[in-house]
Structure formats: C-alpha cells, structure tokens
Design a protein with these regions (language model features):
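Bergerat-fold GHKL ATPase/HATPase_c domain
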Residues: 18-19, 135-213, 217-245, 258, ...
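Conserved acidic segment of CheY-like receiver
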Residues: 19-31, 35-40, 68
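Acidic, metal-coordinating helix/loop segments flanking the phosphotransfer/catalytic sites
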Residues: 48-67
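Short amphipathic alpha-helix used as the core "switch/output" element in two-component signaling
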Residues: 57, 80-92
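Active-site residues of response regulator receiver
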Residues: 71-72, 99
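The feature encodes the CheY-like receiver
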Residues: 75
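Alpha4 helix (beta4-alpha4-beta5 surface) of REC/receiver domains from two-component response regulators
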Residues: 81, 101-132
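Glycine-rich/acidic phosphate-handling loop/turn and adjacent ATP-lid/helix
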Residues: 241-247, 251-254, 258-302
C-alpha cells in the first residue's frame, strides 16, 4: 500500500493578506468544506453550499462570484453536470473540480466539456494545490515553478559547469541549443537523480526525454506550418528527426531541474506555445479509453501523444502552463519517498491566438 505524498508546498504571500476574489465552494462533506474554506478564507471571500441546487441559485443571484470549486459527488447531481450548468449561467467562470475518486474514470466527460483543473483530495497537499490553482486562475499569472516551491533559488548553468551534486532547493536553469546538448543533459540529470535521490533512472530519463522532445521537435515550425527539425516519412505515418540539430536562436528552450527535500523537479519551457488544452485532454482520453474491438488503449498506435499519458502516469504531479503562440511550460514533480494513487489534471491556458 502506498502512503500519500507529503506536501511540497509552503505557504506564500503575506499572512492575512486579502486578495480580491469571491469563490463559491460546493462540498457536502462538512469537515472537507470547513477545511477548504478555512484554508482560503485569509485571502478570499468564500461562500460555501452543500448542494448543486443551492450553487446554481447562488450563481444566478450573485453575479460577482469569480470562481467555482465543486466536489464530483454531490447529492442531486455530479460536479461535472454542475459545472456544465454553471457555464450556461456564467460561460467564462473558472471551475476547479475536487474528488476522492480516480480522475481517469471521468475522462470522457472531462474531455467533452474541457475541464482542465481536477484536484484529488489527499490531505494538506491538496489544500495547497487548491490555493495555488485559485491564485493562478484568478490572477492569470500562471508561470513559474516557484509558485509551488517558493524556497527555490535559481542559478544558471551550462554543460561546462554542470554541478557534481544538486544542492537542496536550488533550481538549475540552462538553455538548450543542440540535439547533442539535449542528450547530454538528459543523461547527466537522470544519473544524478539516481545517485543522489535513488530515483529510477528510467523514469526520470523518460520524463526528460518527453518534455524536451516536445520543445525541440514539435514546437518549432516554419512559416508554412511544417516542423523545422522533423520530416514526415512518405511511406509511413511517422516523423523522422533530423541529425545533428542546431536550433535557431528563436527555437532554443529552457530546461530547469533540481531537488527540494524528497522532491525531484523537472521543468521545460519553450518559446512557442503550440501545445493546447484541447490537445492534452484529447491525448489523455485516447490513452485512457479502451478500443471496444481490442480492449487496448484507443491511442496505442497513434503517431504521437503517448508521451502526455506516460508523463502523468510516472509523475507525482504534472502541470501544463500555456500562453498560446508564445510560451509553454511543463512542470514535473516526482516524490522519491511516497506515491500518489490518483493523479490530478492541471492545464492552464491563456489564449492570445
């Protein structure tokens, strides 16, 4: 049996500081409702109800509600149905879904209605995740791993001065310019995580490979919309990577990594913002939904997209921050001492396109 992962998040902001924002919380379990309300009360105006009917009445009668937090399991209807009806009243209201159940069971409705913030309940860690999610959704300030680990100190490095040991609470940052650099960094980082934190090298290398592959091969395109560093095979539905790649200046991406207590942190930031919330939910759905004819994942033979599913399965937490057409940040957390049974879905998207 796995024990729940301990919280990576420390309190941030000034104690007692009130942030503009009114939140409607829908939770029928009194102890959970009180815990969430008390946790958010110092910064937000929180109105709490226990039923979907009361929630819809509040939304109709209180036009200044800025955000809805709802449990999935409610007396009259589930939280997804409440979210759908809430959007009819308030089309642009941000919605956070919370649950004690396996999010994967609801992947059909998640994809259909574009729910992108689903947090599983697992103690204090989920409370901090809710607080950070609320802050990001209301402020629009979505980028930065320091929102989750405020104690991180950032330091820039290159391959030439790659650290022999990763200092605790230091976020190492480097720019990736070539295919060779990507490979060297992936190997060195994964090996150091194994040596220092006993993290499975196969897992961290898979994560690093996946997040940097998207930044290097799929994000950069030319004026015609074709991939700059991959070529489609004319005989098969596969993409072939160019050899000895040197990225153009505008395509170079940032890789960040480090350790903080029992946590391993990996972040990749590209300057293109081509990944979308719709694509992420679609790919998760493809790999979580069985083909009725084979019983295997529907996306098993897709030419791409499996990496998003693999990342979420391997990591303790996975966060996508997207400013469409400008920037994508993929944040990966891996706990080296404990596991989290059910995984969140966390996709933030600013659409400037």
């Amino acid at each position: 049996m796995t024990k729940p992962a301990s919280a990576p998040f420390l309190d941030f902001g000034e104690a007692g500081k009130k942030t503009t924002g009114k939140i409607l919380l829908v939770e029928d379990v009194e102890s959970i409702q009180l815990a969430i309300r008390d946790f958010l009360f110092a910064r937000y105006d929180v109105q709490s109800v226990t039923t979907a009917e009361h929630a819809l009445m509040s939304l109709a009668m209180t036009p200044d509600i800025d955000l809805l937090i709802t449990d999935i399991k409610l007396p009259e209807m589930n939280g997804f149905e409440l979210g759908r009806l809430a959007r009819k009243l308030r089309p642009n209201i941000p919605i956070i879904i919370i649950t004690s159940y396996d999010v994967n069971e609801f992947i059909d409705i998640i994809k259909e209605h574009g729910f992108s913030q689903i947090i599983t309940k697992h103690g204090r860690m989920s409370l901090k995740e809710i607080e950070i999610t609320v802050e990001k959704m209301l402020s629009g300030d979505i980028f930065g791993v320091q929102k989750y680990f405020p104690q991180l100190r950032e330091t820039e490095i290159t391959l030439a001065d790659f650290p022999r040991t990763f200092a605790n609470a230091v976020l190492y940052t480097t720019r990736v310019r070539t295919l060779h650099e990507r490979g060297e960094l992936t190997d060195r980082i994964a090996a150091q995580f194994k040596s220092q934190k006993k993290a499975p090298e196969s897992t961290t290398k898979l994560v690093l490979d996946e997040i940097t592959s998207n930044a290097m091969f799929r994000a950069p395109v030319n004026d015609g919309g074709e991939f700059k560093y991959q070529t489609k095979n004319s005989h098969h539905d596969i993409l072939q990577t160019h050899q000895n790649i040197v990225l153009d200046e505008e395509d170079r991406f940032t890789l960040q990594f480090g350790v903080c207590d029992e946590w391993i942190i990996m972040v990749c930031i590209d300057p293109h913002g081509r990944l979308t919330k719709k694509e992420i939910l679609y790919r998760l759905h493809r790999h979580l939904t069985p083909d009725p004819n084979t019983g295997l994942p529907a996306g098993l033979h897709d030419s791409h997209g499996r990496g998003i599913f693999l990342l979420r399965e391997q990591l303790s937490s996975l966060v996508f921050n997207i400013d469409r057409g400008r920037k994508t940040e993929v944040i990966c957390f891996y706990n080296t001492t404990s596991a989290q049974a059910y995984k969140n879905i966390s996709v933030y998207e600013i659409d400037n396109v």
